[in-house]
């Protein structure tokens, strides 16, 4: 679950009844995931490299609806990908008591649920402790992806994410979209583009909402075969 062999979840490339490319996703704990922004970029590059599409721009069906993707360079199997995230929404600030302390969250949706809280020191944020507690919080009966965000400059934020079903991950594309929109809501972002720095790299969020797109890299790190018993 770093930069080599391993993963935060499983993505299967399939085709729906209309022969469209389809993304099926499972989290690390085996639960189904409705949408994964980073996974969508990886699936797009995988589809290109393995001959499932000849197009530079195409649709991928997800459990959250169709998503348009665009391969931005001439590389095969690696390079930047732009993904349309659909409509992303954020609600007003709300106070939530977690493990005896009150946290101010902006809750949003990017095809899956997110709760964003802003901190002054991201490195010291209690990501694992609070993120895990939020998964059984009565206000989030289905669990929630939790983003800890620090504003670091003009139209630039840093982010750490505790993903429901996977724990803390190095990056979260849908979380970056919601975090950028939440940062715009509180005045930390005012431009058309926002840069979101994650432990796994930097993503570019394009748009002012509700429709957003994300640009970021996707590259192959390992090929293998696994024999599954029936």
Regions found by a protein language model. Name each.
Residues 1-77, 115-230:
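A glycine-rich beta-to-alpha transition motif near the start of alpha/beta enzyme domains, typified by
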Residues 58-60, 93-100, 106-108, 194-196:
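Short acidic-hydrophobic surface loop/beta-edge motif
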Residues 63, 86-91:
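Zinc-dependent deaminase
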Residues 77-85:
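Short, solvent-exposed secondary-structure boundary/capping segments
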Residues 87-89, 110-114, 218:
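Glycine-rich beta-alpha junction loops
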Residues 89-93, 221-223:
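Short, charged/polar, Gly/Pro-enriched secondary-structure boundary elements
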Residues 96-124:
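Internal active-site segments that recognize and position negatively charged phosphoryl groups
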């Amino acid at each position: 679950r770093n930069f080599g062999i391993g993963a935060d979840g499983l993505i299967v490339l399939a085709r729906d009844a209309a022969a469209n490319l389809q993304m099926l996703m499972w989290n690390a704990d085996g639960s189904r995931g409705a949408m994964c922004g980073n996974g969508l970029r990886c699936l797009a590059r995988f589809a290109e490299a393995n001959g499932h599409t000849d197009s530079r721009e195409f649709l991928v069906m997800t459990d959250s609806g169709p998503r348009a993707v665009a391969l931005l360079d001439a590389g095969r199997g690696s390079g930047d990908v732009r993904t349309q995230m659909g409509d992303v929404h954020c609600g007003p600030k709300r106070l939530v008591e977690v493990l005896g302390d009150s946290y101010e969250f902006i809750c949003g949706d990017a095809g899956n649920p997110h709760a964003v809280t802003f901190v002054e020191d991201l490195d010291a944020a209690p990501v694992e402790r609070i993120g895990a507690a939020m998964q059984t919080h009565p206000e989030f009966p289905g669990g929630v992806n939790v983003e800890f965000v620090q504003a670091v400059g003009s139209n630039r934020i840093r982010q750490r994410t505790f993903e429901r079903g996977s724990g803390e991950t190095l990056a979260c594309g849908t979380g970056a979209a919601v975090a950028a929109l939440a940062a715009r809501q509180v005045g930390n972002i005012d431009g058309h583009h926002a840069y979101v720095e994650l432990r796994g790299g930097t993503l570019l969020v394009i748009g002012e909402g509700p429709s957003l797109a994300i640009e970021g890299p996707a590259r192959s790190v390992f090929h293998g075969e696994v024999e599954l018993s029936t």
